[in-house]
């Protein structure tokens, strides 16, 4: 059963308790430039041709580039971390106005991402950490972060949150979900639900929109649909194709 949902300017549908559809601003880095626009609606929608250029160059040099739940842009460049409101036009010098909130050591992380409540998660040296994000360049984040995973976390290809607070992950060829670990004694993978049987390691990008729609890039093509819920749910077979080719060429792609 589907119900129309209108919340904070988003319009979508509830299907089996999961919001699908809705308007979100897609951001991407392509050939060193930064773009934004509403996400493509079908395979003939040339997103790059209609997207707004919001950064002229240098964006491919970032190791991480992602948004907080509050809409601030975070970036790791040259081992340092910065934050600021996202750029809105191509003459907006984001690095010139962004606040440096970490002086060094940020290249050590394999994953860096937010949960829906604004906590920052990171994987370093096979371990998973969680803490509120740094506020200044003297804030030693890793020293105060809580270790919530004691090993095995470098083996994941994707780690990211659904807006409902569940952690989603790709390990090997398989896709999993569960509430995040709360301590380093919590064997997350052992208790997680398998929601994808194989082939998930072939995706280049895999991420949620703010309303819980799953987006993925595989084989240069861009897909969207509500996320799988059980191991034999063939997501790629039922997902909507919204990009015919070239999506593998993006350096970053996110909401």
Curated annotation (Swiss-Prot):
One of its GO terms (cellular component) is extracellular region. Coiled coil: none annotated. GO terms for biological process: innate immune response. Residues 1-19 form the signal peptide. Pfam families: Tachylectin (PF14517). It is found in: Secreted; Cytoplasmic granule. The keyword Cell division does not apply. Its main location: secreted. WD repeats lie at residues 20-67, 68-114, 115-161, 162-208, 209-255. GO terms for molecular function: carbohydrate binding. Keywords: Immunity, Innate immunity, Lectin, Repeat, Secreted, Signal, WD repeat. InterPro entries: Tachylectin2, Tachylectin2_sf. Lectin that binds specifically to N-acetylglucosamine and N-acetylgalactosamine. Is part of the innate immunity host defense system of the horseshoe crab. Monomer. This is Tachylectin-2. The lineage of its organism: Eukaryota, Metazoa, Ecdysozoa, Arthropoda, Chelicerata.
